[in-house]
Amino acid sequence: MLKVEMLSTGDEVLHGQIVDTNAAWLADFFFHQGLPLSRRNTVGDNLDDLVTILRERSQHADVLIVNGGLGPTSDDLSALAAATAKGEGLVLHEAWLKEMERYFHERGRVMTPSNRKQAELPASAEFINNPVGTACGFAVQLNRCLMFFTPGVPSEFKVMVEHEILPRLRERFSLPQPPVCLRLTTFGRSESDLAQSLDTLQLPPGVTMGYRSSMPIIELKLTGPASEKQAMEKLWLDVKRVAGQSVIFEGTEGLPSQISRELQNRQFSLTLSEQFTGGLLALQLSRAGAPLLACEVVPSQEETLAQTAHWITERRANHFAGLALAVSGFENEHLNFALATPDGTFALRVRFSTTRYSLAIRQEVCAMMALNMLRRWLNGQDIASEHGWIEVVESMTLSSAL
């Protein structure tokens, strides 16, 4: 199997001053191309360290994607490190120098002398075009390893990987079929509870069951070779049966996007009133393109469940909205949810059984509970659901005549 690795460079990445989103993106992208990463390393802006790790990984990896260090400043050392590791010098790539000059001229800017550095490549390097920036990439062969050097700017990195590097890998190597990966997301059950129920299932050869906990949801993932696709799809029915009503969506689209699409398909507009969630619902749904009529964040105040239910019923009528959703303030470990629909208004009062979670986590959980309430109504299910340390203590329904 092809051994593919990644090397991230830069002090800011090494010291945690920025999150290495490029590494996460590449790992996911390559995985779905049948090229799962076998190792990832990070090195700071130190020439000796860079040269050492390039030489080391050249003895183990078939392909190494090096990210960062192709800029015009003194701490951009990737090209020099590659040349040093190979025992050769840097040469000026005249065509890229002219391309950079054109790039700056078209934008009404003068290219500084320091940018010339970005056109200096190891003598044996294969040039790799960057159509969206000034840092060209390049490839070198060092011992057994084909190394690709890429810019750190995420938009430039992704274009180069997708349009330049992946085609070269497909041309040079016989790549396996991409693996099958089935995903679903649950809300309301703990990871250990799900695992206890699912661990009894018999997995096909080479297939693994994965769990990813990211408060307030749990993602279940069944991954395996394409040859086992039929068996995996059959097993997936059992996984969904075991997960039951805790399943809130399949795939990777996300609940706000799926709700947005359902609202649009059924021509429902939505109005929101938030206290405890502080606009989080509006943010998530607006980013997903949901048909929102009006959104408000109001000061927190103590309300009975009936007050919340009547308030959101009136708000739906006043805004001529198809649906209206409310989250009340958080008072005495309790808060209210209410959903006004053409069928009537449904309201829940919940109690937090623990206070150990941060405000941000509690807001995220409550936003998800509200979205799940909406999802369940759209799917014709009972709108009541609980989440571990959140207990439904009261419910009520107002008829649509009110």
From Swiss-Prot:
InterPro entries in UniProt: CinA, CinA-like_C, Competence-induced_CinA, MoaB/Mog-like_dom_sf, MoaB/Mog_dom
CDD domains tied to this protein: cinA (cd00885)
Pfam assignment, any one: MoCF_biosynth
Gene3D superfamilies tied to this protein: MoaB/Mog-like domain (3.40.980.10)
SUPFAM superfamilies reported for this sequence: CinA-like, Molybdenum cofactor biosynthesis proteins
Homology family: Belongs to the CinA family.
NCBIfam families in the record: cinA_nterm, molyb_syn, PRK03673.1
Record PANTHER family: NICOTINAMIDE-NUCLEOTIDE AMIDOHYDROLASE PNCC (PTHR13939), NMN AMIDOHYDROLASE-LIKE PROTEIN YFAY (PTHR13939:SF0)
Protein name: CinA-like protein
